[in-house]
């Protein structure tokens, strides 16, 4: 894998060679890439996000909630640089087996609130695989394909810990090559107890990136945020560019270009971001599954 030397402002240098992270991702379907963002960049992103939260009317719930702040690439140049980190993207391109990738929704700044009423409860549901491996759009008879059509690229603005609702997942579940069975979403998730006996949490330091195969079974677990504090992360669904976007990205692109946010970016970040977030979907290659159009639906995470 090519060596990457030039890093934009606010980007950290991961502690291992890109090939080592890639090998771990190929082995486990999940890897933590440390030091994607510096502490200064993290603080700027937190401050910018809190300013956006304060503008919301009505104000979002203070507890037991998970929501998104839209258009983060217009109000935080650090988010733009974070989602285009060259080491993370090099790992993803190698894993997907193509240079031509894109984001299937605009980068989603998410805020997971502390729990209160949900503390000690075991909510039903939540277990899923990520786009494009959704049962309403992905053909069931193509789950056994050897090719990989999606990666989740999430950036931890705050540390992911067991006490602040680090994402629950089933290690190795991407190899099952099926959507989570119905029983995973019945009776609540009790880690260590069937059918959730193998469930772990994606623990990682602030500034790290979680990169995992989109077929991985996982869920957000708001009920486990006992920290009393918000936990912030940037979510990205990355696919080969022929995979149709999960949602219509046109409005996000319009808001971005009208904001003139790109004028504050270095050339490499600007070009990469435009390709990932604003390029057209590529023609469908021969032999790949046809991803159906996802029907519009209400979303707590605005993407």
Please state what every model-predicted region is.
Residues 1-27, 34-141:
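Non-heme Fe(II)-dependent double-stranded beta-helix
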Residues 37-39, 109-111, 132, 160-162, ...:
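Short, solvent-exposed loop/turn segments at secondary-structure junctions
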Residues 147-150, 158-221:
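Double-stranded beta-helix
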Residues 2-11, 184, 216-303:
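Non-heme Fe(II)/2-oxoglutarate
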Residues 93-102, 143-147, 157-164:
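Secondary-structure boundary elements
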Residues 123-137, 184-198, 225-228, 249-259:
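Short, surface-exposed loop/helix-turn segments at secondary-structure junctions
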Residues 106-108, 153-155, 234-238:
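A structural signal for short, well-ordered beta-strand segments
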